[in-house]
Each structure stands twice: as C-alpha cells, then as structure tokens.
Amino acid sequence: MIKITLKDGKVMEFEEGIKISDIAMKISPALYKKALAAKIDGETVDLMTELHKDSSLEILTFEDEMGKWALRHTGSHMLAQAVKRLYPEVKLAIGPAIDTGFYYDFEADFTFTPEMLEKIEAEIKKIIKENHKLERFELPREEAIKLMKEKNEDYKVELIEDLPEGEVISFYKQGDFTDLCAGPHVPSTGKVKSVKLLSLAGAYWRGDENNKMLQRIYGTAFTKKSELDEYLNMIEEAKKRDHRKLGKELDLFSIHEEGPGFPFFHPKGMIVRNILESFWREEHTKAGYQEIRTPLILNEALWHQSGHWDHYKENMYFTNIDDDDYAIKPMNCPGGILVYKNSMHSYRDLPLRLSELGIVHRHELSGALHGLMRVRCFTQDDAHLYMTKEQIKEEVVGIIKLIDKFYKLFGFEYFVELSTRPEDSMGSDEDWEIATNGLREALDSIGKEYRVNEGDGAFYGPKIDFHLKDCIGRTWQCGTIQLDFQMPERFDLSYIGADGEKHRPVMVHRTIYGSVERFIGILIEQYAGAFPTWLAPVQVKLMNITDSQYDYLKKVEEALKENNIRVEIDTRNEKIGYKIREAQLQKVPYMLILGDKEVEAGKVAVRSRKDGDLGAISLEEFIEKIKNEIKNKTN
C-alpha cells in the first residue's frame, strides 16, 4: 500500500500502481468529472499516471491554472489534428498552451484564411464528439526520429535531434493523430467542451527571423460554452481598450521601426508618467525609503558574481569599453548592492530601505513585443531592503500594506501568490525554508489570502507575486516581494551586530508597478483612456462659442494655470457641439464652455465627462471642486 497526501492534508492509502483518475473517483465522483490533470509532489502530470510510492497529490480542474493549461494544450493538439485531416501536406511545428488559450505553428504552401479557420473549427468539434483518449508513449531517440521522418515532419525531427543522446522521447496519440509532446494532457478530447479559433499570424520558426516564416493559428478552449462566450465578450471589450490604439489616439506614446521595443513618450504621456513616479516617490519617502540611482552600464564581471549571467545572459545587451566587456543592466539589484557595500552598516541602521526607478534593458524576440506591455527597455520601480532575520516578517508586512495602498488607489482588485523553490535555484535547503516561512508568516499575520505556486520562485529565493484584476477580468502580474539570502552571500554583505561581530543581512527585492511602462499600459486599458482627473494629461478643455469671449477665456485659462490645473483651450472657429465631441473623444474630464451669458455673469458652464452638463457656476467654485478631486485622487 502507498500513502497519498491530499491538498487538504488528508492521507489516504491505495494499492501501488493505482491511476490518479481512480483516486479522483474515490475522493468524489463530482471531482472525477471535473478533473483535468494533477500535481504529484509539485509536478503536473496526466490523470492516467500510475502511482508507485508515497506522494502528495492535488487534483487539477479548470479552476486551476495548470488545469486550464492541460486542457488548452490538448486544444492545440486537436487544432493540429484537424489541420492534418483537412490539409495532409501541411507540416507541424510547435503548439503550446499560453495564458489565454493556445496556438500551433504550421508550414503550408498556401495561406490560411478566416474561411479556412471556420472549416478547421468545425473539424475540431467533430474531434471533440469522437472523444479520443489521449495516450502517452515513449520511444528511444533514434526510433522517435524515424517515426517523425516517416510522417515527413521535419520540424519535429529537428526538435528531437536537439535533445541529448539517450534521451527518451514522449509522444501523445489521439485517434489517427500522433504528436511529439512532453504533456500533460486531459484524458480525452471530449473533455474540451468549447473551442474557438481566434486569429492568424506569422511566426518565425523558433522565434528567429533568420528562419522560415510559419503560419500561426491562435485559439482558446473552455469546459463550458458560457465561459467561452464570456471570454469572447472580454476580447471585444479589450479591443476597444487596447492601449496601443488609445495611446495613439490620445497622443500618449509611440513606437517606431527605428527602435522596436523602445517606447517614445509624448508630452501627454510624460505627464501621466511623471505623476505616477512623483506619487511613488512621495509614498516611499513617507514609508522610510531612500532613493538611489545606479548606472545603466556595468562591468560584465558583476553579472557573473550576481548569478544573473547564468540565468539572463541570452536576454542581455553588451558593449566593449577600453577593451573590457560591459553589460547594459537587465536588473537593478547588483548596482543597488554596490551602494549598500559602499558603507559599513550597524544593526542600528537596519532595516535599510533603498528605492530606485531604474531603467533596465532586456532583449525580447521581435514577435513577443507588444506596445508598452512587452518592451526591451523599461523602468523598474525597484526597492531593495536589507534587514536582520528577525525583521523579515515586519518588513514584508510593511511592503504588503504599501502595495495594497497603491492598487486600491487605482481601483484594482488583486490576488496573491506565494512561489516556492524552483529546480534551477541557488542556496541551501535551510535558507530556502527560512525564507519561504518568513513570507508565509507575513501573509498569515495580516490574514491575506494567497495561493501557493510550487516551484515558481526566483532562482535566488521565494517570492510573493501580486496579480491585478482589471475591470474586464484580465489579470496582470505586477508587484513582487522576493526574499534573498543568496546575493548577500555572493557579495559578502555584512553589518555589525550588537555583539560587535559581522553578520550577514537578509535582502528583499520588491516592486509595486513592476514596470512603469507596462503599468501605464494597464492603466490606459483599465480606464479605457479616461484617466481620473488627478492623473489626466489634460484636466480641463476650455472653449468659447464665438470670438467675443476670447479675452474672458484667456483670463479663465490663466486662473486655472495659477492653480496648477492642466488646461487646453479650443478657440477654433467651429461649432461648439463639434468642440465638445472632440474633447469627449480625448477623454478630458471637464469642459468649460464660455458664451456671452457666462462672460456677463462671470461664470463658466461646466460639462463633466462622467456626469454630463453641470450648469453654470463661478470659476472659484469650479476651481475648488476640481482641486479637491485632484487632492483626494478620486477615481
């Protein structure tokens, strides 16, 4: 008999060799029906996996991220199966699950069309009804190559040949279709209830523009049609809110072919950016942080010492200065560590909180670039805190409260994830246990709900990730708190303790916005470009009906500017209705309309983006109203 420990801590005994699907049935028929995959000792596996030793087990459903992933991974195989049925000459490349669905890359001597997608989707629905079992099998490397050559699948052969000699290669078979794959998958194609093919795109093989351009078909999959319908509605809403579209319409930023992945911020975009950064600085000063600035370019040796070389080398940019090799920083932490190391510290100096709005560069493949969301150059709102082990809990609680304050201000709900030690990690088991428990205790002490994401920590320590939920239900990972025992060791950091001896500090890496650029992109989409008054690039649009109000308009403009209200004037010889519509399209919070009546009464006619016509009031009254709104940062 073997002992299986369930997620809730309950221990059950079973015969050795039992399949996970059978355990799911014994736990609950309802769970068996919903089950898609499972985690055994933290590793995601198929439900048909047999268990031969004591293990921890978590049954995954569509409510779990890896459950979704397994279902959508199967969706990609069904897409490939449908394409091969309809167009046997097409060659298969790769087809993974992604955050919102799946895709598959194909080589074809024709171009897929939207009409062909409808035909392929109909074939997928047949495959769902056929309810094929997904069967995993393994072959030695040479036999795997032979199988794929027989099927004329050149890309699969290349993938296998890149694997080490002696590697056992896994495949999945469903009906008449077999694909090279590590899995996991759901038990049968019938588990995938609703599929929608969404779009077509080009994609270079292996993301390398020197390779052949393939055709990529994107799709998504759900266990219920209602969930699919909800997702499709969200996509339509997301198109309206696309920050790339709104960024252009509102003149906030642009991206040019001379610098793909390097955003250009326009004057209005800089207003938003500067407000966010000023607010960030104010709140950090209140919370006891000290701001630093570290260089963009640092000697390559520093990145070897920090360990980033082994993990980030492929995503770094390099240069040579005076015959020595340098790197453009992909992260701020090694530079911040040098600032700490520059002085001797006492236990009385700790915790030391150093913050930095530091520009970093990371190489992203051209196909992955996406407006402000995925760029090659961005500003990371970093802070690095140095403390004793006894201060971990209190400091992490303080960070969580600060992050909470920021996200609530912008109207975001969020959920928290505690990510534990990955396979590719540095440090001792003891340090990892202390670090993970420190984060867990901080979350528990303030009653913050969280989920555990096994094996997804940083290479130097466990972390808490904050996932924002926007107004249309999408999630964005922004803030993070990462506990680190490794960097202080690598850089020989120390402080003098109460005993007069040197001690090693604990280091915490922390962000709130994550990337300032990305956070601006998220805010554009969250607000659909209609920023709250305190954040709006233009807070008031001032417009006259005829030229006779021009002098009064200039006086009003001057009064608004004296009160630090961001105002633009529209004195064009256009109908007032046209001017109002244009201001509305520009998402300006307030319009002040000046006609002869307003001039005579010394008032302004106020139109609110949110509430419509507010009538005529004195300029002093309006200034007081808008200043209160700005001061209170009303959303």
UniProtKB/Swiss-Prot annotation:
It catalyses: tRNA(Thr) + L-threonine + ATP = L-threonyl-tRNA(Thr) + AMP + diphosphate + H(+). GO terms for biological process: threonyl-tRNA aminoacylation. It comes from the Bacteria. The keyword Transcription does not apply. The keyword Ligase applies. Residues 242-532 are annotated as: Catalytic. Pfam families: HGTP_anticodon, TGS, tRNA-synt_2b, tRNA_SAD. Disulfide bonds: none annotated. Keywords: Aminoacyl-tRNA synthetase, ATP-binding, Cytoplasm, Ligase, Metal-binding, Nucleotide-binding, Protein biosynthesis, RNA-binding, tRNA-binding, Zinc. Zn(2+) binds at residues 333, 384, 509. Binds 1 zinc ion per subunit. Residues 1-61 form the TGS domain. GO terms for cellular component: cytoplasm. Its EC number is 6.1.1.3. Catalyzes the attachment of threonine to tRNA(Thr) in a two-step reaction: L-threonine is first activated by ATP to form Thr-AMP and then transferred to the acceptor end of tRNA(Thr). Also edits incorrectly charged L-seryl-tRNA(Thr). This is Threonine--tRNA ligase. It comes from Clostridium botulinum (strain Hall / ATCC 3502 / NCTC 13319 / Type A).
